[in-house]
Design a protein with these regions (language model features):
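A feature for loop-to-transmembrane-helix boundaries and adjacent hydrophobic helices
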Residues: 1-203
């Protein structure tokens, strides 16, 4: 049984808190950027840079908006400017994903290519980024697994029940970050019909 001392704040600089979740998002985008720049030959360097910049912007804005409206709407009502207080923490994965998709859709229109053409070329390199984000979920004590009595179960300090749970975030980090990555590389080795690769990713 593991009892981790998980502090969501990695570095505290006065009033500025640098959180593990934010660092894992940074690691995610850095890894995806490197992989796309190194291995995706259908996008030039400028396109890859634009893709990463606007995707990161979409992730931050979408992630923050998703967190506020789904988990902290009372805070927004009392202080609408709190939506910009990113340093206080609070990013929603699903909101961030939606923000990235909107950014990619806008870029596809700007480049004169079809949305799923772009998605097919990006999707194989996204899984490692998902793995990093799941590690951030673990550090934040989010998405807790089911209670268990296995030897590698985890008691999260923030869990009000205080029971041993599956470290589901780590399972997802392995499944989404490694297994899915290898699978996506396998199916993307040969030319596929449009949306075939991104369709497999969504499934």
């Amino acid at each position: 049984m593991l009892i981790p001392e998980l502090d969501p704040v990695a570095i505290q600089l006065g009033p500025l808190a640098i959180r593990w979740y934010g660092l894992t998002w940074l690691a995610a985008f850095s890894t995806i950027y490197f992989l796309i720049k190194r291995y995706q030959k259908d996008l030039n360097v400028e396109q890859v840079s634009d893709l990463m910049f606007y995707s990161l912007l979409g992730a931050i804005l979408g992630g923050r908006a998703g967190y506020i409206f789904f988990y902290s709407i009372e805070q927004f009502i009392s202080n609408p400017l709190s939506i910009f207080f990113i340093w206080q923490g609070g990013l929603s994965f699903h909101g961030g994903l939606l923000g990235v998709l909107i950014a990619c859709f806008w870029l596809s229109k700007s480049w004169g290519v079809q949305f799923f053409w772009l998605m097919d070329r990006v999707a194989p390199f996204v899984p490692p980024g998902l793995g990093f984000v799941r590690l951030g979920n673990f550090m934040n004590s989010e998405l807790l697994g089911r209670p268990t009595d296995i030897s590698w179960g985890v008691i999260f300090p923030s869990d009000p029940l205080g029971v041993t749970r599956h470290p589901s975030q780590l399972y997802q980090a392995f499944g989404e970050g490694i297994v899915l990555f290898l699978y996506m590389l396998l199916i993307s080795r040969n030319s596929k019909p449009k949306m075939n690769i991104s369709g497999h990713f969504l499934l």
